[in-house]
Protein backbone atom coordinates (compact mmCIF):
# COMPACT_ATOMS: atom_id res chain seq x y z
CA UNK A 1 0.00 0.00 0.00
CA UNK A 2 1.41 3.36 -1.04
CA UNK A 3 0.25 5.40 1.99
CA UNK A 4 1.69 8.64 0.60
CA UNK A 5 -0.38 8.36 -2.57
CA UNK A 6 -3.45 7.11 -0.70
CA UNK A 7 -3.49 10.13 1.64
CA UNK A 8 -2.43 12.77 -0.89
CA UNK A 9 -4.89 15.69 -1.16
CA UNK A 10 -7.03 15.71 -4.27
CA UNK A 11 -6.56 18.37 -6.94
CA UNK A 12 -8.88 21.37 -6.95
CA UNK A 13 -10.69 20.20 -10.09
CA UNK A 14 -11.51 16.89 -8.37
CA UNK A 15 -13.35 18.62 -5.50
CA UNK A 16 -16.98 19.06 -6.51
CA UNK A 17 -19.72 20.94 -4.72
CA UNK A 18 -23.47 20.99 -4.58
CA UNK A 19 -26.09 23.05 -2.85
CA UNK A 20 -27.86 21.35 0.02
CA UNK A 21 -30.51 22.29 2.53
CA UNK A 22 -30.92 25.93 3.44
CA UNK A 23 -28.51 26.96 0.68
CA UNK A 24 -25.45 25.32 2.28
CA UNK A 25 -22.67 24.24 -0.07
CA UNK A 26 -21.33 20.70 0.35
CA UNK A 27 -17.92 19.68 -1.01
CA UNK A 28 -17.22 16.11 -2.10
CA UNK A 29 -14.99 13.81 -4.14
CA UNK A 30 -16.71 11.57 -6.69
CA UNK A 31 -16.76 7.86 -5.95
CA UNK A 32 -14.91 7.19 -9.22
CA UNK A 33 -12.02 9.42 -8.07
CA UNK A 34 -11.93 7.64 -4.70
CA UNK A 35 -11.86 4.22 -6.40
CA UNK A 36 -9.16 5.40 -8.84
CA UNK A 37 -7.03 6.58 -5.90
CA UNK A 38 -7.44 3.27 -4.07
CA UNK A 39 -6.58 1.27 -7.21
CA UNK A 40 -3.48 3.39 -7.87
CA UNK A 41 -2.20 3.14 -4.28
CA UNK A 42 -2.92 -0.54 -3.55
CA UNK A 43 -2.00 -3.86 -5.12
CA UNK A 44 -4.96 -5.78 -3.71
CA UNK A 45 -8.45 -4.30 -3.26
CA UNK A 46 -11.48 -6.19 -2.00
CA UNK A 47 -14.91 -4.66 -1.32
CA UNK A 48 -17.55 -6.83 0.35
CA UNK A 49 -21.13 -5.85 1.07
CA UNK A 50 -21.68 -7.53 4.45
CA UNK A 51 -25.20 -6.33 5.14
CA UNK A 52 -27.94 -4.30 3.52
CA UNK A 53 -31.23 -3.24 5.02
CA UNK A 54 -34.12 -1.75 3.07
CA UNK A 55 -36.61 0.23 5.10
CA UNK A 56 -39.68 2.17 4.04
CA UNK A 57 -37.81 5.37 3.18
CA UNK A 58 -34.11 4.54 3.63
CA UNK A 59 -31.48 1.91 2.82
CA UNK A 60 -28.41 1.11 4.92
CA UNK A 61 -25.33 -0.80 3.71
CA UNK A 62 -22.36 -2.18 5.67
CA UNK A 63 -19.22 -2.79 3.64
CA UNK A 64 -15.80 -4.19 4.36
CA UNK A 65 -12.91 -2.62 2.47
CA UNK A 66 -9.68 -4.64 2.39
CA UNK A 67 -6.59 -2.88 1.03
CA UNK A 68 -3.44 -4.99 0.82
CA UNK A 69 -4.56 -7.14 3.76
CA UNK A 70 -5.71 -4.29 6.04
CA UNK A 71 -9.48 -4.11 6.69
CA UNK A 72 -11.89 -1.30 7.59
CA UNK A 73 -15.69 -1.39 7.81
CA UNK A 74 -18.22 1.36 7.41
CA UNK A 75 -21.94 1.98 7.07
CA UNK A 76 -23.55 4.07 4.36
CA UNK A 77 -27.13 5.17 3.97
CA UNK A 78 -29.42 6.86 1.48
CA UNK A 79 -33.01 7.99 1.42
CA UNK A 80 -35.22 6.26 -1.17
CA UNK A 81 -36.23 9.09 -3.50
CA UNK A 82 -36.76 7.01 -6.61
CA UNK A 83 -35.74 3.42 -7.18
CA UNK A 84 -34.39 1.18 -4.44
CA UNK A 85 -31.49 0.33 -6.75
CA UNK A 86 -30.42 3.98 -6.97
CA UNK A 87 -30.66 4.30 -3.18
CA UNK A 88 -28.53 1.16 -2.70
CA UNK A 89 -25.93 2.47 -5.14
CA UNK A 90 -25.79 5.77 -3.26
CA UNK A 91 -25.54 4.04 0.13
CA UNK A 92 -22.76 1.78 -1.18
CA UNK A 93 -20.83 4.83 -2.43
CA UNK A 94 -21.34 6.53 0.93
CA UNK A 95 -20.04 3.48 2.83
CA UNK A 96 -17.06 3.08 0.50
CA UNK A 97 -16.04 6.74 0.89
CA UNK A 98 -16.29 6.45 4.67
CA UNK A 99 -14.18 3.28 4.69
CA UNK A 100 -11.62 4.91 2.37
CA UNK A 101 -11.51 7.89 4.73
CA UNK A 102 -10.64 5.48 7.57
CA UNK A 103 -7.55 4.53 5.52
CA UNK A 104 -6.64 8.23 5.22
CA UNK A 105 -8.10 9.05 1.80
CA UNK A 106 -9.08 12.76 2.17
CA UNK A 107 -12.54 12.35 0.63
CA UNK A 108 -14.98 13.52 3.33
CA UNK A 109 -15.41 17.19 4.17
CA UNK A 110 -17.60 18.48 7.00
CA UNK A 111 -17.26 22.17 6.35
CA UNK A 112 -19.13 25.09 4.88
CA UNK A 113 -15.92 26.63 3.53
CA UNK A 114 -13.95 25.34 0.58
CA UNK A 115 -11.48 22.63 1.67
CA UNK A 116 -7.75 23.08 1.24
CA UNK A 117 -6.33 21.40 -1.83
CA UNK A 118 -3.07 20.08 -3.19
CA UNK A 119 -1.18 23.10 -4.49
CA UNK A 120 1.68 20.99 -5.80
CA UNK A 121 3.98 22.09 -2.96
CA UNK A 122 3.26 19.25 -0.56
CA UNK A 123 0.56 20.95 1.49
CA UNK A 124 -1.62 18.62 3.51
CA UNK A 125 -5.26 18.78 2.47
CA UNK A 126 -8.23 19.44 4.70
CA UNK A 127 -9.36 16.43 6.72
CA UNK A 128 -12.08 16.08 9.28
CA UNK A 129 -14.05 13.52 11.20
CA UNK A 130 -17.09 11.78 9.79
Place the predicted regions along the sequence by residue.
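Positively charged, aromatic-enriched nucleic acid-contacting surfaces
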Residues: 24, 29-125
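Accessory terminal regions of nucleic-acid processing enzymes
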Residues: 130
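N-terminal, Lys/Arg- and Ser/Thr-rich interaction peptides
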Residues: 1-28
Amino acid sequence: MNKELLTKPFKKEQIKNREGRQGMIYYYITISDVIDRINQACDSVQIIVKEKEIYESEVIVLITLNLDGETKESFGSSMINGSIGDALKSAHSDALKKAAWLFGVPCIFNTTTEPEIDNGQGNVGFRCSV
